[in-house]
Each structure stands twice: as structure tokens, then as C-alpha cells.
Amino acid sequence: MDLSTILGLVLAVASISLGDILEDGNPLHIIHLSSVIIIVPTSLFAAMTGTHARYVKAAYKEIKIVFLNPKINLNETIKNLVELATLARKDGVLSLEGRVAQIEDDFTRNGLSMIIDGKDLKSVKESLEISIEEMEEYYHGAAHYWETAGETAPTMGLVGAVMGLMLALQKLDNPAEMAAGIAGAFTATVTGIMCSYAIFGPFGHKLKAKSKDIIKEKTVLLEGILGIANGENPRDLENKLLNYIAPGEPKKSQFEG
């Protein structure tokens, strides 16, 4: 569970509510059903219009990444690659054939299968790089959907406010009802801005940020697979791959006690 996502959402709503309460307001008055209906679905539908269908599907499929941390452990990934490099250097690349069948990750399995089959390194590298590029495009397309919804929401809030004002002005003969209608109209603006900057926009930014971690793992795997194919010294390969671990994160070497 990514607590920063949950805390961010909760604290954003709490901050707005607290500010309203300090001015003797009632946060529940901000929740206006008609405003929510005008803004939320319309923003999502508008984003759908401007996003390729496969990325719309990806946006909802991968939204879980915003709330859950991807199962990525670069130290473990590097450890596995170094073990494979050690085995390949000792017994040859063909000795990896039995291990490849046990690997769950398609990217790793495909890469190792290609070098076991004797494909030239240039072809292996190009194939894996294309796979990484497509994966990056996939996640960026999904993030684009949520970012577009975030960009659209404030405008939909203005649409809701204008519609509310139009209805309120029809009640000029009843000042009390007109005032209530005007107040209700402006809740649409608040709802649109909140949806944009506290929900949809952050969803897109978080999805894009986390996709970078996924792409980094695939890049480490690519470098490791090419190192295995080149017969690199396992220690040298490990030193190179450990550089991909972010500063401040622990780096675990198999060759240190």
C-alpha cells in the first residue's frame, strides 16, 4: 500500500474542510450531487475522447499502481542476474536453459531465450529495447488519460457554475432561493478544482512516476542479459548494475561479507 497516495488525498480534503470550518462554514455544503455529476463523469468522458482506446483501458487497469507499490526489488533482480552470469560463465550460456523455464517474468525469459538460441547481440538488444519503449508508451498513455481528466475538470467546474447561475437567475422573484442557487452554483467550481489538483492530476503524475521504476527494472534486466551474453565477469556486472539503484537506497553485493 502506498500511504503517500492515501495520506495526500485525505489531507487535501481535510485541509479544505478545516479552512471552511474556520470561517464558520460546513464542508458538507460543498458536496453538491448535481455538481459532481456534471464534473466527474464529463471530465472522464472528455479524457476518453482525447485518449486512444487502449490507453483508456490501461488507465483503469493500472490505477492500482497509484495505491499499491509495484513489486520491484532491484537488489534481488541484480542478485538473480549475477547468479545467472556466474552459471553461464562457468558452464556456458546453454546451461541456463533449465533455469529459463522457471522464470515468470516474460521480458527476462524472452531475453535469455534469445541468447540461448544463439541470436546475435544486436538483435537481442534491439528486440528488448523495443519492448521497453512499448512498455513506456503504455504507461505514459495511461497517465495521459488521468492528466487530461485533471486538466478538463476545472473547466467542467465553470460549466457547472454557469449552468447553476442560469438556473438561479430564473428565480429573481424569490431572492432567498436565488441566493441558495448561486451558492450551489459555485460549489461546482470548487469541485472541479479539487478533482483536478487533488485527484485526477495527481493520479496521472503518480502513475507516470511509478512507471519509471518499472522501466528502470527492465533496463537493469536488459543490461544484465547483455552482460551474460557477453560473458562479463559477474563481479563487474554487479558493480555496473548496482549503479542503477537510487542514492540513499541500500546496495547489496554478493561478493562482500
Swiss-Prot record:
Belongs to the MotA family. It comes from Helicobacter pylori (strain ATCC 700392 / 26695) (Campylobacter pylori). It is a multi-pass membrane protein. The lineage of its organism: Bacteria, Pseudomonadati, Campylobacterota, Epsilonproteobacteria, Campylobacterales. The keyword rRNA-binding does not apply. Pfam families: MotA_ExbB. Keywords: Cell inner membrane, Cell membrane, Chemotaxis, Flagellar rotation, Hydrogen ion transport, Ion transport, Membrane, Transmembrane, Transmembrane helix, Transport. The gene is motA. Signal peptide: none annotated. MotA and MotB comprise the stator element of the flagellar motor complex. Required for rotation of the flagellar motor. Probable transmembrane proton channel. This is Motility protein A. It is found in: Cell inner membrane. Each stator complex is composed of 4 MotA and 2 MotB subunits. 2 A subunits and 1 B subunit are thought to form a single ion channel, so that each stator complex contains two channels. The keyword Membrane applies.
